[in-house]
Amino acid sequence: MGQKVHPIGLRVGIIRDWDAKWYAEKEYADYLHEDLAIRKFIQKELADASVSTIEIVRAVNKVIVSLHTAKPGMVIGKGGSNVDALRAQLNKLTGKQVHINIVEIKKPDLDAHLVGETIARQLEQRVAFRRAQKQAIQRAMRAGAKGIKTQVSGRLNGADIARAEGYSEGTVPLHTLRADIDYAWEEAHTTYGKLGVKVWIYRGEVLPARKNTKGGK
């Protein structure tokens, strides 16, 4: 089943944390739709800023949004102009006070979302799908990945019948829950239709923090 389960969802609560941290009862649906609107708006406004993860934490009439990006300078802008404009737009969208935290991704070649995004953009620029995948794998392994697997599916090279083709290097232990595996999928919009891009990156093992029990044991 490790091949079929979402690698991140399988590890939430073990070595991964939730991307949205809040609790609600009657307002649950409203908050969920608001989260989706925030994420969609940020992804549209910062499409070229290499934004990977968007974390949302809620307090009373306050929303804290943490943006993980490989290009913090582009998100912040000159003198903070871009982030101020983004904050004002999110305040208007949600009707609440929004705080924005910028978190820099120091190794973008180890982030599955950014690697998948790079492959997708290359496919849109008519780069050969095998070359795009192999280059991404080489960069990830040089950056310190223990293993990486990529897959591109769809009408490859304009073929009449859609198929999937992938490459891998190193190990990607999907069944090991303590394995830090980052996973993402992206879409490339080509003249022959959409191509799907999937990326799995194994970054090493993480031992879950031992929880304190009563009695200090």
Swiss-Prot record:
One Pfam short name = Ribosomal_S3_C
- Is this entry keyworded Ribonucleoprotein? yes
Q: Which GO terms describe its cellular component?
A: cytosolic small ribosomal subunit
Q: Which residues form the KH type-2 domain?
A: 38-106
Q: Name one GO molecular function term.
A: structural constituent of ribosome
Keywords (A to Z) from UniProt: Ribonucleoprotein, Ribosomal protein, RNA-binding, rRNA-binding
SUPFAM superfamilies on file? Prokaryotic type KH domain (KH-domain type II), Ribosomal protein S3 C-terminal domain
Q: Which residues form the signal peptide?
A: none
List the PROSITE patterns: KH_TYPE_2 (PS50823), RIBOSOMAL_S3 (PS00548)
GO BP term, example: translation
The entry sums up its family as follows: Belongs to the universal ribosomal protein uS3 family.
Reported function: Binds the lower part of the 30S subunit head. Binds mRNA in the 70S ribosome, positioning it for translation.
Assembly information from the UniProt record: Part of the 30S ribosomal subunit. Forms a tight complex with proteins S10 and S14.
Q: What is this protein called?
A: Small ribosomal subunit protein uS3
- Native source species: Streptococcus thermophilus (strain ATCC BAA-491 / LMD-9)
